[in-house]
Amino acid sequence: MRKEWVEKRKKDSVRTQMYYARQGIVTEEMEYVAKVEGLDPELIRKEVARGRMIIPANINHLHQKPMAIGIAAKCKINANIGSSALASDAAGEVEKVKVCQKYGADTIMDLSTGGDLDAIREEVIKHAEVPIGTVPIYQILHDCNNKIEDLTIDKMLEVIERQAQQGVSYFTIHAGFLLRFMPLVAKRKMGIVSRGGSLMAAWMMHYHKENPFYTAFDDILDICRKYDVSLSLGDSLRPGCLADASDDAQLEELKVLGELTLKAWDKDVQVMIEGPGHVPMNQIERNIKIERDYCHEAPFYVLGPLVTDIAAGYDHLASAIGAAMAGWYGASMLCYVTPKEHLGLPNAEDVREGIVAYKIAAHAADIARGRKGARDVDDAMSDARYKFDWNKQFELALDPDRAREYHDETLPQDVFKEAEFCSMCGPKFCSYKITQDILEKHGA
Amino acid sequence: MRKEWVEKRKKDSVRTQMYYARQGIVTEEMEYVAKVEGLDPELIRKEVARGRMIIPANINHLHQKPMAIGIAAKCKINANIGSSALASDAAGEVEKVKVCQKYGADTIMDLSTGGDLDAIREEVIKHAEVPIGTVPIYQILHDCNNKIEDLTIDKMLEVIERQAQQGVSYFTIHAGFLLRFMPLVAKRKMGIVSRGGSLMAAWMMHYHKENPFYTAFDDILDICRKYDVSLSLGDSLRPGCLADASDDAQLEELKVLGELTLKAWDKDVQVMIEGPGHVPMNQIERNIKIERDYCHEAPFYVLGPLVTDIAAGYDHLASAIGAAMAGWYGASMLCYVTPKEHLGLPNAEDVREGIVAYKIAAHAADIARGRKGARDVDDAMSDARYKFDWNKQFELALDPDRAREYHDETLPQDVFKEAEFCSMCGPKFCSYKITQDILEKHGA
C-alpha cells in the first residue's frame, strides 16, 4: 500500500517519518495512523516530530501497514519469532508470522539464529503486514562463524545495511552498554541476561575496547536515516531477576540510551527505548517515570516485566501482570513473553498464548488510561452476555476459537448458542434472567 | 491437630478466635499462625481482636491447619470446587480438593449444587486440611426443590446450622443486598451477576419483603458464634462488567456490609468482606481504600478483579492482573478464576491453571508490599538459574511438573539437568557463562 507514497519521495534527501514531521509535513503514513488510532493527523505529526511517537516503516517494506508506537497511540504488543540451529526453515517462520498476525501482534521481531538468515528474513518480511524488527548482532555473530572476537565495525555495518536494505523497520542495537559498567554488572545477582548484551560484553572483554555499537553509532544512524529504520535502543543490562531490578547497572545504561536518543534525533532517526525485564510491582511506575526523564519521552518498549521469578511455565502470565501495569503507567509497547520463557523454545501454541496474554495486558492498559473508545468492545461483550448472544461473545473475545472451544466442551449443540443460560448456573437460576425481571418491575 | 486445643475450651461460653483474642488470650491457633507467618503471636492476637485478621477455624474441623486472612499476613488465595447437576459424585470433589491442596490453595469453597450435598461436604471437609467455605443459599435452594419462594427463615437457619455443625469454617452470606437497591440494579449494564445475589433478588421480588439474611442476621450470628464460623459477607451486587464497576449499587451494598461487620464483631464473630469482580486497573486501589473505610478494615476478599471483559478463555489471566494489584494495594485473599469463567464448568486442569495464576498474583503482591522474606524464594530461583541447577529450578517453581515438562520438551535427557546452558541460547553463548567471566575479571 505504500508503493506510491514512497515512490514520490524518491528525490528527498532524507526520508524518515521524523524528518517529514519536523518539516511540518503530514505523510500518508501519518494520515493512515491517525485514522487507525482515531486521532488528529496533526497530533500524529507533532508527536513524531517531538520523538514521543514512532512510525517504524522501512522505505523498502512497501506492503507494510503503518502503525504507531507512542504514548498518544494505543498500547502495542510485539511477538518474537525466529529460527534456531535446531529448527531453521523459512516455512516454519512464515507459519509463525501468520499466527502472530492472526492473534494481533502489532510488530514482529525476527530473532533467527539458525539457517539462511537472509532468506528467512526475506520470507518473513514478504509475509508481514506489520513492521519487522531484528537484533542485527545475531546475524553479525552468525557471519563471524560464532566467533564474537571476529566482529569488526565494517562487518557490523555491512550486516546492518543489508538488513535495512531488505526492509527491516526497527533494529535493536545494544549501544548503551559501556566498558565502564562492568563493575556494576559484577555486583549483580544475575549479571547479564540479554543475549545481545552478553555478546557485547564478550567482545569488550576480549579487546578491552569500547562497545563497537557505541563507537560506530553515527554510522549506524546514517544507515537508519537512509532507509527509515527506527532504533530500538537495547537494554543489555536489563535486570534478570527481581533482586537486580532498578539497580545501577540498569539505570546507568538507561542514561546512555538517553544520550543516544538525542544523537539519533539529530539525524531524524526515530527511536524507542527497551526496558525490563524482571521488576516487582511496586517499582514499575518508577521505572516508567525514570525512562521518560532520562530518555526525553522517547517511547518505552518493555519486556513484561515479570513480577516474580518463580513462575516458570507461566511466565507469560507473570509478565502480563507487569506489562499491563507498565502500559497503564505509560509504556508504549509490550514485548510478549511465552509460557516457555526460561525453559525452552516456544512452539506455535506458545506464541498464541503469549500474544493473547499481551493483548489482554495492552487492552487493559488502554482502558485504565481512559483512552477514547477503549472500553467499547468490553461494553459490546457485556451486552452480548446480557442478551445470551453466544456467537457474538465468541466473536468479540480476543481469542474466538478458544472461547468457542471452552463453551462447547459443556454445551456443544448449536441450540445452546442462543440459550438463555449457560452451563454455570443452568436454565432455572440464571442471574441475567433475574436481572431482566427486576428491570421489568423497576425500570431502567 | 486441633483436637486437644478445642477439647479444653469445651466449657467456655464463647469459643471464637475473636472472643479469645479480645480476652487477651493467644490461642494455639494464633501461635500456629504466628509461626507460619513469621510474626509475633501477640501481633496475631491484636489483629484478630481488632477484626483486621481472621482465623477461619470451625471448632468441628479438627484436622484443619490454622491459617490467617488479614493485611498483616501473607496474601491468600481461595479455589472454588463443587458438584453440579451433571457431575455430582463426592469422589470427584475429593479429587479436586487434592488438586487444590497440591497446588497451594489456602482455602477451598465447596459450591456444590448437585447430588447429596451433605455427603459431598462431609467428604470434602474430611479430606481438607485448609478451611472450607460454603454459600449456604445453594443448599437452602436445593432443599426447597429449587423453588426460591419456598425459602423461609427457619429453613435457612436450619441449613446454616447443619453446615456449621459439619465443620464449615466460613459462610458467604448475601445479607447486604437490600430491597431499596433494586432501582440501582436497574440502572446497570449487567445487573446482578452473583448467583446468590440473584436468588435473593428473586425472593425479595416475589414477597416484596426485605432480604431474609439481613432480617435474620442476628440468628445467623448466633450460629457462627457457636461454631466459630467466620462470615464472608457476600457482594451480591459486585459489578459484572467494567461499565458497572464502582457504581452506586456496589458501593451502597458495601456500606451495609460495613454495618453488618460491626454487628458481627459485637458477637465476637469473625468477618471478611467480599469484593469485585470486574474493575479497570485505574479503579482497583480506590476500591480497596473504600472497603477499608466502609468496613472498618475487615479483611477484603476479592474475586479477581478482571481488568477487561473480552478475555473469555483467558479470564484466569485477565483476573490475575487485577488480583495481583488488589493484593498489593491491600486485599487479604484472592478468589481464583479459571480459564472456563463465563464459558463453562472448570475441570481439574482448569483448577490447576487457576490456582497457579493466583499463587503468582498473591506472591507478587507479597513481594510488592515488601513482606519480610517474600522475595527469598525468588532469589533462590535466581541463584539456581545462575548455577544452571535445573532440578532446583523445577523444585522452586510454583508448578514444578509444568516447568520440568516444558524444559524437557526441548532437552529431555538427564544430562541436560546439569548442563551449563539451556535450549534458548545454546552452549556457546549463554549469558550467564559470560557474566561469570566478567565476575572473574572484575570481582564481585
From Swiss-Prot, chains A, B:
Any GO MF annotation of the entry: carbon-carbon lyase activity
Report residues binding [4Fe-4S] cluster: 422, 425, 430
Q: Which residues bind Zn(2+)?
A: 278, 342
- What binding partners and quaternary form does the record give? Homodimer.
Q: Which GO terms describe its cellular component?
A: cytosol
Q: Which cofactors are named for this entry?
A: [4Fe-4S] cluster
> Which organism's genome codes for this protein?
Nitratiruptor sp. (strain SB155-2)
Q: What's an example GO BP annotation here?
A: thiamine biosynthetic process
Main EC class the enzyme belongs to: lyase
Which keywords, in A-to-Z order, does the entry hold? Answer: 4Fe-4S, Iron, Iron-sulfur, Lyase, Metal-binding, S-adenosyl-L-methionine, Thiamine biosynthesis, Zinc
Q: Which Enzyme Commission number(s) are on file for it?
A: 4.1.99.17
Designated name of the protein = Phosphomethylpyrimidine synthase
Question: Any binding details for the cofactor?
Answer: Binds 1 [4Fe-4S] cluster per subunit. The cluster is coordinated with 3 cysteines and an exchangeable S-adenosyl-L-methionine.
InterPro entries, A to Z: ThiC (IPR037509), ThiC/Bza_core_dom (IPR038521), ThiC/BzaA/B (IPR002817)
NCBIfam families referenced in this protein's UniProt entry, alphabetically = PRK09284.1, PRK13352.1, thiC
The biological pathway it contributes to is: Cofactor biosynthesis; thiamine diphosphate biosynthesis
What the record says about family reads: Belongs to the ThiC family.
Query: What reaction is this protein's catalytic activity?
Result: 5-amino-1-(5-phospho-beta-D-ribosyl)imidazole + S-adenosyl-L-methionine = 4-amino-2-methyl-5-(phosphooxymethyl)pyrimidine + CO + 5'-deoxyadenosine + formate + L-methionine + 3 H(+)
The job of this chain, per UniProt, is described as:
Catalyzes the synthesis of the hydroxymethylpyrimidine phosphate (HMP-P) moiety of thiamine from aminoimidazole ribotide (AIR) in a radical S-adenosyl-L-methionine (SAM)-dependent reaction.
